A protein has these predicted regions:
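Predominantly flavin-linked oxidoreductase catalytic cores and closely associated redox partners
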Residues: 16, 123-255
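Short beta-strand to alpha-helix junction loop
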Residues: 101-121, 170, 233-241
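Glycine-rich FAD pyrophosphate-binding loop
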Residues: 16, 28-49
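Conserved Rossmann-like nucleotide-cofactor binding loop
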Residues: 19, 42, 168
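N-terminal FAD cofactor-binding segment of flavoenzymes
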Residues: 40-90
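Beta1/beta-strand and adjacent pyrophosphate-binding region of the FAD-binding site
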Residues: 3-19, 35
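Flavin (FAD/FMN) cofactor-binding core of flavoprotein oxidoreductases
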Residues: 255-268
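Hydrophobic anchor at the start of a short beta-strand
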Residues: 11, 32-34, 161, 203
Length: 268
């Protein structure tokens, strides 16, 4: 192993999703050398969420202590081309049939374009993003007292490492294995479908038997299209997740165009 084959950077970020790109942009704006490693060939593809994105007003309405962070506010200045449908209202339906209505300051967006937009901002700020580069393992260099990152496209060291790989915490798993103290096991699998049909104007959430120990959602993306999905804790659902979603969409007379999915961490 030659030291010449190892590339050193100040900060390496694993994952070019919204968190990774935002962190990279902020660091680059401060003049810090930052490299983002993304395992996929296209940022944001495939999408792994319901595609509801909050505006700044919704963020500070929920997290009031963030209001004075002007630099953070800039991250929520989105161009109109990312906004497919404005979400001004939300409804939550309980198993009893009772519902609650809330005002909302958000929009339905296209995650592929949204993630690409954030990655472009990070690169314009001076960050470097390398695609199709997956982290394979971490090796401790005892003499140098640092970790060696072994990837599909080379080896790296860094002063600081940021794990922005998503809810399954790829870096944490490589470093700590199945240690429950650093990797909670309670991960909720989710599945969604892009659908066509008579969809509501509001962002609707359903609790109860439709998604045991979880929730289902309908996020309208325009007059006839929506992102419909559900997340259920493992072991709480009879049958497979995809079949359950198909029945949910059939009950709503919605035509399924495509499927996607992801994970939601519970408890940490």
């Amino acid at each position: 192993m030659s030291a010449k084959d190892i590339e050193h950077r100040q900060v390496i970020v694993i994952g070019a999703g919204p968190a990774g790109s935002a962190a990279a942009q902020r660091l680059a704006e401060e003049g810090i050398d930052v490299l983002v490693l993304e395992r996929r060939s296209i940022v944001g593809n495939p999408a792994q969420c319901g595609e509801c994105i909050p505006h700044w007003g919704e963020v500070i309405g929920t997290f009031k202590h963030l209001e004075d962070h002007a630099w953070l506010k800039e991250y929520f200045d989105f161009p109109e081309r990312l906004i497919l449908h404005r979400l001004d209202n939300m409804r939550v339906f309980l198993p009893s049939g009772k519902s609650y209505h809330f005002e909302l300051d958000a929009f339905a967006g296209h995650r592929l374009q949204f993630d690409g937009f954030l990655a472009d901002k990070a690169e314009r700020a001076g960050a470097e993003i390398r695609m199709s580069t997956s982290l394979k393992r971490l090796q401790q260099q005892r003499k140098a007292n640092r970790e060696l990152l072994v990837t599909s496209e080379g080896r790296f060291t860094c002063d600081y490492l940021i794990d922005a790989s998503g809810s399954l915490a790829h870096v944490g798993r490589l470093r700590h294995g199945q240690d429950k103290d650093v990797r909670p096991e309670d991960q909720v699998p989710t599945i969604y479908a892009q659908v066509k049909g008579d969809v509501p104007e509001t962002f609707d959430v359903f609790l109860g038997s439709v998604a045991p120990s979880g929730y289902a959602w309908i996020i309208p993306k325009g007059p006839e299209f929506a992102n419909v999905g559900l997340g259920v804790r493992a072991g709480k659902l009879e049958g497979d997740l995809k079949g359950h979603l198909e029945r949910f969409c059939a009950d709503l007379n919605l035509e399924i165009i495509s499927f996607g999915g992801g994970w939601i961490p519970m408890g940490g």
